[in-house]
Amino acid sequence: MVQVRGAAQGPPEPGAAGPGVIGDGDGAQAAAGGPGDGAQAAPGGPGDAAQSSSGGAAAPAEAPRGEARYYEQSFRLVLWRHGQTRWNVEGRFQGQSDIPLDEVGERQAERAARLLAGLRPAAIVSSDLGRAMATAAPLARLTGLTVTTDKDLRERYGGLWEGLTDSEIRTRYPDEHAVWLPPAGESSAAVADRAGAALERIAAGMAPGTLVVVVSHGAAIRLAAARLLGFPEDLWGAVGPLANCAWSILGRRRSRWRLLEHNAGTLPEPVLSDDR
């Protein structure tokens, strides 16, 4: 179990987040980085007491509201997909084959790390596959954190599909392709259970207000997120795929998970994935 303790982390810094926050009806609808209920913090931050104009006693500090309160009272997981590989470009099913980042993927990781470092992560946990570890490395250098690995964050095992293109899979395994179940590989439910359990283990060691970056893979992230959000299996496809080096953010408060961001990133990237 990853033990994560420390001071509460604030909301993302401007420019360090992607699309707007997806709220759940509690007033947290806002563009990334802004207070969820439209209230603007006083100069000096919500934790500073306001001084009266007469120079008298300070007024009580206003309690954080909306999105700021959510960040203070919850913890967050940044689910970061690895950078681009040659097999991504060629459209080959990677699965658990240990394919390294290409030069583009390395640049993507460096660029994304500069933004993610601004979120002040308390820990970095990665799949043990090389492309995930190489993606985590620039963030580890910037933050001074040590990367912890968890093999349960690996991509879906593709069995006989690994190394094949989608057209080759469709031709050789039409029945299995129709239901997206690789022969000798993992089902979507198995991936959701495995990767979802890994995220729950990480969350169990987190203190309120902390943020952990989890480096994983497209299908593993998508399916684990759908599992934690409580989606029925027939709606898992509603969570779309991730571009290389993009991330999603899950938050949890009072045992309830919610999706804060999905497929956020540094620049628009095409989705090159064997997930669907």
What are these regions (language model features)?
Residues Q3-Q9, P14-P19, G56-E72, R111-R172, ...:
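Phosphate-coordination/substrate-recognition cap region in phosphate-metabolizing enzymes
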Residues V78, Q84-L139, A184-G196:
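Loop-to-helix element that buttresses phosphate recognition and phosphoryl-transfer chemistry
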Residues H82, H217:
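Short, conserved phosphate/pyrophosphate- and ester-handling motifs at nucleotide-, phospho-/glycolipid
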Residues T171-A190:
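Short glycine/proline- and acidic residue-enriched helix-loop micro-motifs
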